[in-house]
């Protein structure tokens, strides 16, 4: 059994199918119908519980080759967990996978009702425990727990040292991963790692870019010198967890990189940090965008793209003073992409690499290559 307590006073008890223990985090909902493993292993969900709108979970098991990272969300909530998986590539059940990663698995919850609660109240802090079941004690622990905006989440998911990305890329012909080809000429880019998904790095690799992954706290001078020496051709700012406004030191360094006119590309948190660094602070959405079925309009082509999304924060409309808005969300008309006028920078709020989700926005990686070739 697992007991849940939300900051709005809701107390629930359900079945446990994951790890044992107690976790505190922010509760968000995800509307993806598949790809639960990629969601669970996405560093952007660090410090969060994910409730899936898809009522069934576990039917394809789990395969560690498909992980986005070594990091995980705090826990997952589903209407029904299916222990009997069917997938030729799976090597364990989802339950076994969650236990290995220390992730709580919670089933038997009325997820429809819970998601409606989140839509009404917004994202809520929550505590879940397989150990403590007293409502008052859970309430007390949650009351004294730090808010997610005050937690140093990025530092817990960023690389501690500079490394080269050489992860193999999935081959749909063989249904396995093919090795990185060192013989192919690659432009080298620096990746500021705020919690990068593995498939973002794979897609950068697939368009001919070799990624050197730098810690989130890397000084701007180090990257500027590398660019001036032609050791790198540009900089990519990754996705990541938490409130972008909590990263004040990193924002100061990004401001220096912008002033140096280095070609840059940001996704999700990276997109937000580029905005804040130029004086346009983000604001928090009521319940965020989480899922792989969000329509986004490309304002330059008028095409509508179905995208993968995972964020709680958004850049403000005032960004139009220094940037051309290239994409908008068709659910709420929020900004999804910009091209800056004052520097060679593009950024998007959604995830063009998908994983999970459609790849209708994959062309953005090629746009970044074109940006690099222009400098």
Curated annotation (Swiss-Prot):
Enzyme class: ligase
Pfam families for the chain: CPSase_sm_chain, GATase
InterPro entries associated with the record: Anth_synth/Amidotransfase, CarbamoylP_synth_ssu, CarbamoylP_synth_ssu_N, CarbP_synth_ssu_N_sf, Class_I_gatase-like, CPSase_GATase1, GATASE
Family membership: Belongs to the CarA family.
Enzyme Commission number: 6.3.5.5
Full protein name: Carbamoyl phosphate synthase small chain
Stretches assigned to the Glutamine amidotransferase type-1 domain: 188-375
Quaternary structure and partners: Composed of two chains; the small (or glutamine) chain promotes the hydrolysis of glutamine to ammonia, which is used by the large (or ammonia) chain to synthesize carbamoyl phosphate. Tetramer of heterodimers (alpha,beta)4.
Catalytic activity: hydrogencarbonate + L-glutamine + 2 ATP + H2O = carbamoyl phosphate + L-glutamate + 2 ADP + phosphate + 2 H(+)
NCBIfam families: CPSaseIIsmall (TIGR01368), PRK12838.1 (NF009475)
Binding locations of L-glutamine: 44, 240, 242, 269, 272, 310, 313
Taxonomic source organism: Helicobacter pylori (strain J99 / ATCC 700824) (Campylobacter pylori J99)
PROSITE patterns hit by this protein: GATASE_TYPE_1 (PS51273)
SMART domains, per the entry: CPSase_sm_chain
GO molecular function: ATP binding; carbamoyl-phosphate synthase (glutamine-hydrolyzing) activity; glutaminase activity
Role noted for this protein: Small subunit of the glutamine-dependent carbamoyl phosphate synthetase (CPSase). CPSase catalyzes the formation of carbamoyl phosphate from the ammonia moiety of glutamine, carbonate, and phosphate donated by ATP, constituting the first step of 2 biosynthetic pathways, one leading to arginine and/or urea and the other to pyrimidine nucleotides. The small subunit (glutamine amidotransferase) binds and cleaves glutamine to supply the large subunit with the substrate ammonia.
Alphabetical UniProt keywords: Amino-acid biosynthesis, Arginine biosynthesis, ATP-binding, Glutamine amidotransferase, Ligase, Nucleotide-binding, Pyrimidine biosynthesis
Pathway membership: Amino-acid biosynthesis; L-arginine biosynthesis; carbamoyl phosphate from bicarbonate: step 1/1; Pyrimidine metabolism; UMP biosynthesis via de novo pathway; (S)-dihydroorotate from bicarbonate: step 1/3
Annotated segments matching region CPSase: 1-184
Active-site residues (renumbered): 268 (nucleophile), 351, 353
GO aspect biological process, one term: 'de novo' pyrimidine nucleobase biosynthetic process
